[in-house]
Amino acid sequence: MNIKTGDKVRVIAGKDKGKEGSVTKVFLKTDRVIVEGVNKVKKHQKPTQAEPKGGIIEKEAAIHVSNVMLLDASKKKTIRASKRESNKK
């Protein structure tokens, strides 16, 4: 996968199309990423000893890698992420 934690990305598909954010977590096995401030979902939290106040919380859900593109910080344009192989050893 060519997207790493901390990369700036733009969402190119889905309900949050056009939004930008930085990658906070990468799931390599499922090819998904969590982007800061994007794809918010509401989760019903049960009260526990660690979190005595339950209720409905908002958190970011994972997005498939095919729905995001790397963002070039200098030009503010999206770029295609690809691996380059060199013939050097």
Curated annotation (Swiss-Prot):
GO terms for molecular function: rRNA binding; structural constituent of ribosome. One of its GO terms (cellular component) is ribonucleoprotein complex. Keywords: Ribonucleoprotein, Ribosomal protein, RNA-binding, rRNA-binding. CDD domains: KOW_RPL26. It holds the Pfam family ribosomal_L24. GO terms for biological process: translation. InterPro entries: KOW, Rib_uL2_dom2, Ribosomal_uL24, Ribosomal_uL24_CS, Ribosomal_uL24_KOW, Translation_prot_SH3-like_sf. One of two assembly initiator proteins, it binds directly to the 5'-end of the 23S rRNA, where it nucleates assembly of the 50S subunit. One of the proteins that surrounds the polypeptide exit tunnel on the outside of the subunit. Belongs to the universal ribosomal protein uL24 family. Part of the 50S ribosomal subunit. This is Large ribosomal subunit protein uL24. It comes from Oenococcus oeni (strain ATCC BAA-331 / PSU-1). The gene is rplX.
